[in-house]
């Protein structure tokens, strides 16, 4: 299962200020609601606008994920920002990664940071290419990481070359 979308995680303090969590004064307490992904039509509810009664809001929370049977799912890849974040407790992190494990997923690829769309696309393309060549998930992912590092290094070099003659020198 591969989802390329927008991920979110808010601390309880941050959630108090967000439109979506203001729908109920108790939503911001639940870490399973403060972590999730936004799917089709989710922007409407995300901005605090009302949705028709009985309609899905397009926001898939960690709580909802944990209630889905994904026991036949070997790998979930979330090409989305900050999907591995969650509330930290003595027994681990409470967020989407725990929810996918509770749902039965064997392996998960998530991000702790904001992700660049182009770099993410290229990295995932390389990852799946390596998987189809018969490599295991770990080796394919490591190869994709090395590929994207090389790609990024080349991009930085190209930018330096492009602008090197335009940067003024400082005279002392």
What role is predicted for each listed range?
Residues 1-172:
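Catalytic cores of enzymes
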